[in-house]
Amino acid sequence: MSLFNTVRNTIVPVHKEGYPFVAAFFVASLVLGWIFKPLFWIGMIFTLWCAYFFRDPERVTPQDDDLVISPADGKVSAIQMVTPPAELNLGSEPMLRISVFMNVFNCHVNRAPMHGRIVSINYRSGSFVNAELDKASEDNERNGLVIETGHGQIGVVQIAGLVARRILCWANPNEPVDAGERFGLIRFGSRLDVFLPAGAAPRVSLGQTAVAGETVIAEFASAKGPVISRRS
């Protein structure tokens, strides 16, 4: 294997949404270094951190239509039955909600939790309280997707946080989506909520670390039996 291929396979790529930020930090480092040389290295530390924040690693997604995959890197912060946000139009009956909180050190690229078709996308403006708080689901800026799957409609909600001020979503209504497929990004700390209908059982526990596109967070009952053992 050539040195070029070794380096390419070792370095985690940066998502294109991060290019302007990385470039800005680098230019600022050059300017600061011109004023006072040690400031260049301080600026480069922030430049590398910015590149790390916008990293976009490849993931290996389990291929099973009964599995629900984590849409985000982070910590499982909530597993509860709640009424879904009204803008999702998923009815008034409680659904299983699994929340994954992303801090500023997590990868912030969001991925689809299941195979299906995007039914709708609904953006709501709001405040920017700590995304780990329960009220963030109702008060904060958010963007909700409804996906039609083989087990019915599920909701995926991107929630802005205390620092995050920009939700990005590249998906469009009526488009097909694959489990683990990238569909959006939230800048600088945020949360993802997944709303699941009856028949879904959680396969993670509170406080567990989840990996977007890889960690199974829930599973739907099927005739073939469970694929993942239930987490206590």
Curated annotation (Swiss-Prot):
Cofactor binding, note field: Binds 1 pyruvoyl group covalently per subunit.
Cofactor(s), names only, from the UniProt record: pyruvate
Localisation: Cell membrane
Keyword Membrane part of the UniProt annotation: yes
Gene Ontology biological-process entries: phosphatidylethanolamine biosynthetic process
Residues with the Pyruvic acid (Ser) modification: S190
Membrane topology listed for this record: Peripheral membrane protein
Active site: S190
Main location: membrane
EC code(s) of this entry: 4.1.1.65
Pfam families according to UniProt: PS_Dcarbxylase
Subunit structure: Heterodimer of a large membrane-associated beta subunit and a small pyruvoyl-containing alpha subunit.
Protein name: Phosphatidylserine decarboxylase proenzyme
Organism: Rhizobium johnstonii (strain DSM 114642 / LMG 32736 / 3841)
